[in-house]
């Protein structure tokens, strides 16, 4: 819940002109600021922070792929550590979202990473591998090539 609409607008106005074509640069904003970010971003990729794995239905407070696409958002973060920690998202949930996003020709940004306890136990590689394998279950190689993996340790 960082960045209000006004703060998002100011950020995009300050950063967007500085973006070069040497890399893909983006901002993921809360839902309410997505349209503001899209309106101001000429060079920045604008991503949603989350999406639901169903096309539609009675999922109060959730946002569908169709809703995001309607406002021009084509990138979405999946499996962020905060979603896993505070909302109980699982590898299976991330996979369901991944399949939904890819089916709708959007670009998923799949977050993976270990906790401090897992790091200290020396299981980082196993944890991250498990998360990646689960996220990409039933994803064709061509579709996987349209995705991004973001490594972010949870500590």
Locations of the language-model features?
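Short, small-residue-enriched loops and turns at beta-alpha junctions
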Residues: 1-4, 53-58, 84-86, 116-119, ...
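Conserved N-terminal beta1-alpha1 strand-loop-helix module at the mouth
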Residues: 1-63, 144-145
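Alpha-helix N-cap and loop-to-helix initiation/capping positions
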Residues: 3-11, 60-63, 88-93, 119-131
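Structural detector of well-ordered beta-strand residues that form the stable sheet scaffold
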Residues: 26-28, 47, 77, 109, ...
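Histidine- and/or cysteine-centered catalytic micro-motif in compact active-site loops
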Residues: 30-32, 51, 81, 113-115, ...
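Alpha-helix-loop-beta-strand connector modules within alpha/beta enzyme cores
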Residues: 31-46, 95-108, 133-135
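Glycine/small-residue-rich loop that forms an oxyanion/phosphate-binding "nest" at active or ligand-binding sites
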Residues: 42-100
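Active-site rim beta-loop-alpha module in soluble metabolic enzymes
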Residues: 105-155
């Amino acid at each position: 819940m960082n960045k209000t609409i006004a703060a998002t607008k100011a950020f995009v106005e300050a950063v967007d002109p500085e973006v070069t074509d040497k890399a893909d640069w983006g901002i993921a904003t809360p839902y309410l600021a997505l349209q503001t970010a899209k309106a101001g971003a000429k060079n920045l990729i604008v991503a949603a922070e989350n999406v639901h794995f169903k096309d539609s239905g009675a999922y109060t407070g959730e946002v569908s792929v169709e809703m995001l696409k309607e406002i021009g958002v084509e990138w979405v973060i999946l499996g962020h550590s905060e979603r896993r920690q505070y909302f109980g998202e699982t590898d299976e949930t991330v996979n369901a979202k991944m399949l939904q996003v890819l089916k709708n020709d959007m670009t998923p940004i799949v977050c993976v990473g270990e906790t401090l306890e897992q790091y200290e136990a020396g299981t980082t590689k196993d944890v991250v591998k498990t998360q990646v394998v689960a996220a990409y279950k039933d994803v064709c190689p061509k579709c996987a090539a349209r995705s991004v993996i973001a490594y972010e340790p949870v500590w």
